């Protein structure tokens, strides 16, 4: 009771506690950003729009995130493909292995900026029932966040 009274008197907020204890759950929740938890650089799985389905599967398997992004002939990110997209495409087509990435990618994907709090990213993924988020800076893909990675951090 004395500690709470003192905290109230000094206007001590959760953010102040987080700064003093950045490794704790509250600290991580209030301080870690998308930039801190994202996979970036060569670790981001990317395929060209005209790559065959087998190449898409290979890329997703090699990177182990469960998703790959799709870029067009101008190297602009135009979509993403998840494990689920692959399963749905196989279920709908007898010619899946003749398909290219653009045939079964999701053009509308959810993204966040690199400064978005990791806890907010986790909330977005839970609300939208998705396992990953693109991290975009303008039109540039700078990273990808996997829900499992955030949960492992204790956020």
Language model features by range: what are they?
Residues 30-44, 98-109:
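Bateman (tandem CBS) regulatory domains
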């Amino acid at each position: 009771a004395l500690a709470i009274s003192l905290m109230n008197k000094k206007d001590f907020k959760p953010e102040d506690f987080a700064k003093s204890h950045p490794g704790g759950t509250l600290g991580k929740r209030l301080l870690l950003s998308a930039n801190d938890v994202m996979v970036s650089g060569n670790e981001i799985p990317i395929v060209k729009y005209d790559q065959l389905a087998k190449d898409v599967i290979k890329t997703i398997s090699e990177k182990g995130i469960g998703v790959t992004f799709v870029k067009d002939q101008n190297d602009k990110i135009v979509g993403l493909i998840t494990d689920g997209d692959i399963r749905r495409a196989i279920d709908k087509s007898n010619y899946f292995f003749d398909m290219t990435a653009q045939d079964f990618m999701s053009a509308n994907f959810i993204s966040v900026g690199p400064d978005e709090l990791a806890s907010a990213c986790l909330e977005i993924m839970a609300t939208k029932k998705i396992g990953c988020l693109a991290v975009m800076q303008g039109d540039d893909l700078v990273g990808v966040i996997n829900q499992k990675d955030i949960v492992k951090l204790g956020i």
